[in-house]
Design a protein with these regions (language model features):
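An N-terminally biased module of ancient metal coordination in phosphate/nucleic-acid-related enzymes
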Residues: 1-80, 87, 151-164, 168, ...
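Active-site gating/metal-coordination segments in enzymes
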Residues: 61-63, 68, 73, 77-117
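Intrinsically disordered, low-complexity N-terminal regions enriched in serine/proline/glycine
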Residues: 3, 107, 226-228
Length: 253
């Protein structure tokens, strides 16, 4: 069992019905989790009002599980240098950053057929965006590494080249103390074959000294703390150790 979950969304994100803060805290206690991080999306400074609402509601729950309140922040898809959509990160316990949208295009692909860019052009933009993203020391965790890649290009053709990019990203992540997330939801976006290959991304991270951290990316209470896909990855890695929440968020015990 992994006794924490550092990527959970609430109903305030608009696509997680039933994920009240009270329901999240109740589920965390039912699962016996020691710590969770609630990490809804923020896009502008005004979104911190939502974060403070979540923080107040979590405090009112008075559950046994430690609740950190952070945010998932996207890169700005209007640019290709990895800058975030907002730099207003103060006061967030856990900053997860990643990208869901194709750089310079801004769409959310469900498969390569949705990517209007030529694959080679996408790979160039994906590389510059990823490397810029992990050059930002304000970030604690790189969200779901490779998920956009899997949705935008044919992995059979481009995965080996992507591993070379991940090597560069891992070196920068280690330098800036940015963990890589073992994301359970990503497994549902991959074929069975690629679920079995995904560990290779994290092997690159470990080789560079990058911390690994777990997050379910839950949008319903039942998904919290689940790690079926994550266990497929972990059993193939040379070490099963995950970083503790305090390590990733750079907190003192």
């Amino acid at each position: 069992m992994i006794d924490y979950d550092l990527h959970i969304h609430t109903e305030y994100c608009g696509h997680a019905a039933g994920m009240t803060v009270a329901a999240i805290c109740k589920q965390a206690d039912l699962l016996g989790l020691r710590a969770i991080a609630i990490t809804d999306h923020i896009f502008e400074p005004a979104d911190h009002a939502k974060i403070e609402t979540i923080r107040a509601e979590a405090r009112a729950c008075q559950g046994r599980c430690k609740v950190y309140v952070g945010a998932e922040v996207d890169v700005d898809s209007d640019h290709t240098d990895g800058r975030l959509v907002t730099d207003a990160l103060e006061g967030l316990d856990h900053v997860i950053a990643g990208f869901h949208y194709v750089p310079t295009v801004g769409n959310y692909p469900r498969g390569p057929q949705d990517n209007v860019l030529a694959a080679e052009a996408f790979m160039d933009l994906w590389q510059s965006t990823l490397l810029g993203l992990v050059s930002n020391p304000k970030i604690h965790t790189l969200a779901h590494p490779g998920r956009l890649l899997a949705a935008a290009v044919d992995l059979d053709v481009h995965f080996d080249d992507a591993l070379g990019v991940f090597e560069k990203a891992a070196a920068l992540s280690a330098k800036n103390d940015i963990a890589w997330e073992l994301n359970e939801l990503t497994g549902y976006r991959l074929s069975g074959y690629w679920q079995e290959q995904w560990w290779r991304i994290y092997a690159v991270a470990l080789e560079a000294g990058v911390k690994l951290v777990y997050g379910s990316d839950a949008h319903v209470p039942e998904s919290m703390g689940q790690h079926i896909f994550v266990d497929i990855i972990r059993e193939k890695l040379p070490t099963h150790r995950l970083a503790r929440p305090e390590e990733v968020m750079r907190l003192q015990e």
